[in-house]
Each structure stands twice: as C-alpha cells, then as structure tokens.
C-alpha cells in the first residue's frame, strides 16, 4: 500500500506512518525504505501517536510552503530574465533608428512560423522570447556605421557583419535555455540557405532552424517598415521578395509555412504599427 501511494504523483506526498507489531529493526528499515515517514510499534499510546501525527502533518505543511516559495521565486527569476532579454533587444533596435515595435512584430512572426513548423509549444514560446535578441550585437557597431543614411562601403559592411558575433559574445554561454536560444538566433539569423550568408557561411539545414525562422521574420518586417533612409515596401512586394529568395536566402519549406500565415501576419502588423 505504501509503495502504491508513493508511486502515484497525486498521493506521493501524503505522510505515511506504520503502526505495527513487528519490532525488528529490519522491518522498521524496510518500512522507511518504502517511503514511510515514521514507524510505531505496538503497544501504542494514543497521545504519542496523535503527537507524532501532528508533527508529521506540520512538517508536511512546512515542506509544501517551502516548495511553493521556491516555485514562486523561480518564476520571478524567469520573468526577470525575460524582461532583461526584451529590454536588451529593444535597446539594440533604438540604436539602429528602429522602433521597439520591430522586435515585437518580428517575434510574433517568428512564433507563427515556428507554430506552423512544430507543435512543441514550449519551443515556440522560447523562440518568441529569444527573437528580440537577434540584433543585440549592433550595440557594438560604431554610430558612424550604424546610423549612416547612405550605402555602406566595403569596409563598413564588413564591420557591420560582425554584429552577429558581437551578439553571441554579449549573450555569452549561460546554460539558461532562453539565453542559449537567444545566442543561436543572434549568431545565425544572417546565414543564408545557399551558404552566402554570414558570419559562418552555413548552408541549408546546417543553419539552426531558429536562425532560419528569424531570418524570414526579420527581413519581412524590415522591408515593410519605414526608416529614415527608406520608405516602407508594400506588403505584396515584400511577400514577392520572400518568395523569390526561397531556396537562396531562405529555407523554402519555411517560406511556404510563412506564406500560409499571411492573414495572421497582417493582423500583427496592424496591431503594432510604428506610428
């Protein structure tokens, strides 16, 4: 009975006290091994039994309170980490003459693609929260390059490309799943399906799936958003470019999934306008 109680998640935390005529220490050890919290041999004294029951119930309540407190603090820590990631992502966008809505929109677009690709909700949510960090490395790019209104020359473009590696360095190698995925996104979202991207020239499925997803979301939102140096593209023109670059810049399978989500994409775009 004790083994059954302890093996069921619903009843596993119920304190079990053995009351038995078996007084051998081996029997007592076996009862405790099975999960009992106490072992009382007969003859018994009702006041003593009642006292020990109260003690174990109090200990059980205290353990439950501690578990709840740990869970609450863990959630608070997770929320704090999430807020820091979001703030860093927005900070990078503001340095680049972009609004904070860019990271919000493209994060939603990325989650739409992820949800069409996989039914793993935890992974989709994690990607949604990691996506704002895609351009955090721009913090390390000089203003003379980052804010230049015209085209970059060859040297400036080479330096701009380092922002992917800067982003990975800023995020670091922390084992936290959110930061790990943020690092992947920062490092891989400028890789291209045909291997012509940067920083590593990865090709095809060698590019992490998260980087391939964010690449589509980022480019689409950048094209359809107005900037000091360019007008916003019409949605149809941006969609056509994404289509035309399937198999070269973008993963063709993910492009198809993105195109299937266009109605939801347009809803998100209207929900978070720059103006």
List each language-model region with its residue ranges:
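Alpha4 helix (beta4-alpha4-beta5 surface) of REC/receiver domains from two-component response regulators
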Residues: 3, 7, 12-13, 23-38
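Amphipathic alpha-helical coiled-coil "transmission" helices that mediate dimerization
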Residues: 51, 58-86, 90, 94-97, ...
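Alpha4-beta5-alpha5 switch/output surface of CheY-like receiver
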Residues: 1, 24-28, 45, 141, ...
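Metal-dependent catalytic cores of enzymes that make or break cyclic nucleotides
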Residues: 82, 89, 93-275
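C-terminal output helix
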Residues: 40-53, 57
């Amino acid at each position: 009975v004790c083994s059954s109680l302890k093996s069921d998640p619903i009843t596993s935390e119920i304190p079990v006290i053995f009351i038995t005529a078996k007084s051998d220490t081996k029997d007592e050890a076996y009862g405790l091994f099975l999960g009992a919290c106490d072992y009382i041999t007969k003859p018994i004294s009702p006041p003593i039994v009642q006292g020990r029951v109260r003690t174990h119930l109090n200990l059980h309540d205290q353990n439950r309170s501690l578990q709840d407190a740990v869970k609450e603090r863990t959630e608070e820590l997770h929320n704090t980490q999430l807020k820091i990631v979001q703030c860093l992502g927005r900070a990078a966008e503001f340095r680049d003459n972009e609004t904070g809505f860019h990271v919000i929109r493209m994060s939603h677009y990325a989650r739409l693609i992820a949800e069409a690709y996989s039914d793993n909700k935890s992974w989709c949510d994690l990607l949604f929260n990691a996506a704002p960090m895609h351009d955090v490395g721009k913090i390390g790019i000089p203003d003379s390059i980052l804010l230049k209104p015209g085209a970059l020359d060859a040297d400036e473009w080479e330096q701009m490309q380092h922002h992917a590696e800067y982003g990975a360095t800023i995020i670091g190698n922390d084992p936290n799943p959110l930061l790990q995925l943020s690092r992947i996104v920062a490092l891989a979202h400028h890789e291209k399906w045909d291997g012509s991207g940067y920083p590593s020239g990865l090709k095809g499925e060698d590019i992490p799936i998260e980087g391939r997803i964010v690449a589509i979301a980022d480019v689409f939102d950048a094209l359809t958003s107005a900037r000091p140096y360019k007008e916003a593209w019409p949605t149809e023109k941006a969609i056509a470019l994404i289509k035309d670059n399937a198999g070269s810049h973008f993963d063709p399978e993910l492009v198809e999934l993105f195109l299937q989500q266009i109605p939801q994409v347009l809803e998100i775009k209207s929900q978070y306008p720059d103006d």
